Amino acid sequence: MGGTFDPIHNGHLVAGSEVADLFDLDVVIYVPTGQPWQKKHKKVSAAEDRYLMTVVATASNPRFLVSRVDIDRGGDTYTVDTLADIRAEYPEAELFFITGADALQKIVTWRDWEKIFDLAHFVGVTRPGYELPKDDEGSDDPLSKEVAAGRLSLVEIPAMAISSTDVRERATSGRPVWYLVPDGVVQYIAKHGMYVSSE
């Protein structure tokens, strides 16, 4: 599962758990982005902080691992590179790439997006009420074509109604984030002064 994880929240964890169950996955590898190319105009917390929050959040689930592959590579993070690196590390594994369906809507802007469906089966997780692309080979929508080709599955996850943006905004304004993120992440945010307004 790739993501900025700024911060990782319970929706990410529920999504990983649900997808692992639905697709009978042995493990879910959370991969925090190093430099998210699509967020250059936004303030993003340091990669090391996002990595450590992800480690804290996933530690209690034996099916969850965290990879530094994007952070250690340096430079902008592109999914095609992430998948190639994970494939090199696990050459015999059948890979599934879990991401938000909202991110998938912008997939045609991703570097080498046509190649990424050859590297992994994509699973787009959605928030309730989100319109899922239809299984339609004749459609001009690239996502509908991938669904029809069996290279993309879409799964609705009720807990995905939580967003990292909302968590950051709540923390910045001094509102509680308990039960939106794991307890260890709440403590990490407080200890390291994450998302404190500079005003």
From Swiss-Prot:
Superkingdom of this protein's organism: Bacteria
Example GO molecular function: nicotinate-nucleotide adenylyltransferase activity
Enzyme class per UniProt: transferase
Record-linked CDD domains: NMNAT (cd02165)
GO terms for biological process, alphabetical: NAD biosynthetic process
Catalytic activity line of the entry: nicotinate beta-D-ribonucleotide + ATP + H(+) = deamido-NAD(+) + diphosphate
EC number, as in UniProt: 2.7.7.18
Pathway: Cofactor biosynthesis; NAD(+) biosynthesis; deamido-NAD(+) from nicotinate D-ribonucleotide: step 1/1
Alphabetic keyword roster: ATP-binding, NAD, Nucleotide-binding, Nucleotidyltransferase, Pyridine nucleotide biosynthesis, Transferase
InterPro entries: Cyt_trans-like, NadD/NMNAT, Rossmann-like_a/b/a_fold
Pfam family, one: CTP_transf_like
Role of this protein: Catalyzes the reversible adenylation of nicotinate mononucleotide (NaMN) to nicotinic acid adenine dinucleotide (NaAD).
Family classification: Belongs to the NadD family.
HAMAP family found in the cross-reference section: NaMN_adenylyltr (MF_00244)
NCBIfam families from the UniProt entry: cyt_tran_rel, nicotinate (nicotinamide) nucleotide adenylyltransferase, PRK00071.1-3
Protein name: Probable nicotinate-nucleotide adenylyltransferase
